[in-house]
């Protein structure tokens, strides 16, 4: 459990409500199912039953979930991409009054490509109790189903919808060896994959859709496949660059310069780039010295 109030006795947050499960006042980040209603944890249900207020993106969507588990007496507040400062302040007022607040998204884990982070930042600043419950998300199941390396991966949110932004985003992956996970929409995924194939020639691309639902499917992308009929939630998983690809020191100069600009030491950046590219640490180190000078 993430405790963000350093060196503070948790009892100061205790809510006076008593029941089968006692929870202290504060903000609880509660994951919700991404497709199958049964993919909710017992602890998440405990929090939803015990909380005073449920903060959600859409009261209709959250209302259906609560009703499915016979939780019908909860006050619901909308907090989404269109939320204003007054909406955030209203929630903070409840928290400072000692209320138990559950923050949920329409589907999956709150704050993952989802509104809510501004509220969390303020909660941390004010020293209000905060905890995040583990639970459903689309990222890890997609990575598991892809069959691509999962020891190192990067989640990049939604792939850009505009052409230049998409190309720039994909170009930035060229010299990186970890697996990449992105969200995309059914109407854009064919174009996105075509651009990825053009720029990252030879990389494996997996499309995973409808995770945990009846028509869950993993597709190995091929330009010949007709994807016009794809529906549902889409996750795109992209293979990283093979470390066996021959790269020159000139190829990694942007990586070195970027690391130097971030203030990384020559030793650290040499280790990091060697791990990603397979080049010798000593060669990278010496080349970085020349660039630094």
Please report, for each region that a protein language model flagged, where it lies by residue:
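Glycine-rich, flexible N-terminal cofactor/catalytic loop recognition
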Residues: 6-80
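A contiguous loop/helix-start segment that scaffolds small-molecule binding in enzyme catalytic cores
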Residues: 12-13, 24, 100, 179, ...
